[in-house]
A protein has these predicted regions:
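Bacterial N-terminal signal peptides that target proteins for export
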Residues: 1-8
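Position-driven detector of the extreme protein N-terminus
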Residues: 2, 18-20
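Acidic, polar-rich low-complexity tracts and alpha-helical solenoid repeat scaffolds
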Residues: 22-243
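Bacterial N-terminal signal peptides
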Residues: 8-17
Length: 243
């Protein structure tokens, strides 16, 4: 399942190329800070799409790994530089402990959009905030005590997310296209595969059956129906639990 936007990495310390000092920041970080300042200083509502694009570019720069076994840029930053980065990079949640990540802060961006954004921005970031859970995983996933995330089949979360993003694309087809299309594709992949459940096969069957009733014309509906048949006739072909 593609979770590119999460960028929560658990990186083994296989290599070390030396500390990066505070003044050696990637250009994308400065561009994000400038984009954020422009939004916060705006006297009239404006689109937050440039800010979102800048945030994703900064995220990529913070998590960039230059070579095999190397560390992410944020890991290589010296302690003074890291502390300054945390102070300067408002709107991001950063970690370089056991979990290494740099994630745009959903609550911060939602509040910003409600104050400064257009209707498309306000609606987008309301959904965006609900999309992430406390672990900065998509809400339809759970990590628990597992080494990898599982899918919360049977709880209705998948369908609620799918309905919300589908409606957003219907209302604002030109807005935030990269994120919305990828999010819908990820949700469709989850229901189409019907594996890696957090619970049991019955929860998968309930979720998939309800999904095709609620979204009979979804691009993934045929695949979901096939998976339901497979679960009934050959359940061991693709077990619902991931190890």
């Amino acid at each position: 399942m593609s979770l590119r936007r999460i960028l929560v990495l658990i990186l083994p310390l296989l290599g070390f190329t030396g500390m990066v000092h505070a003044g050696e920041r990637p250009a994308a970080i400065g561009a994000y800070v400038e984009a954020l300042s422009k939004v916060e200083q705006a006297s009239q509502p404006l689109s937050l799409e440039p800010l979102m694009a800048a945030a994703l570019a900064a995220q990529d720069a913070l998590m960039e790994i230059q070579g095999l076994g190397d560390q992410a840029w944020i890991e290589r930053l010296d302690e003074a530089g890291y502390q300054k980065l945390q102070a300067d990079l408002r709107g991001f949640r950063l970690s370089r402990g056991y979990d290494i990540y740099a994630q745009p802060d959903p609550a911060f961006l939602d509040a910003l959009a409600q104050q400064h954004g257009l209707a498309a921005d306000r609606d987008f970031f309301r959904l965006y905030r609900r999309y992430w859970n406390e672990d900065l995983l998509p809400a339809y996933l759970s990590i628990g005590k597992r080494p990898t995330p599982c899918v919360r089949f049977g709880e209705g979360v998948l369908q609620d997310q799918y309905a919300g993003w589908s409606e957003y694309v219907r209302l604002y087809p030109e807005s935030y296209q990269g994120f919305t299309r990828q999010t819908l594709a990820d949700l469709e992949e989850a229901v189409g595969l019907g594996v890696c459940t957090c619970t049991d096969a019955a929860s998968v069957q309930r979720e998939l059956g309800s999904f095709v009733e609620r979204f009979p014309n979804s691009p993934v509906a045929a695949k979901v129906r096939s998976r339901l048949v497979e679960l009934k006739e050959t359940p061991d072909l693709r077990p619902v639990l991931c190890r």
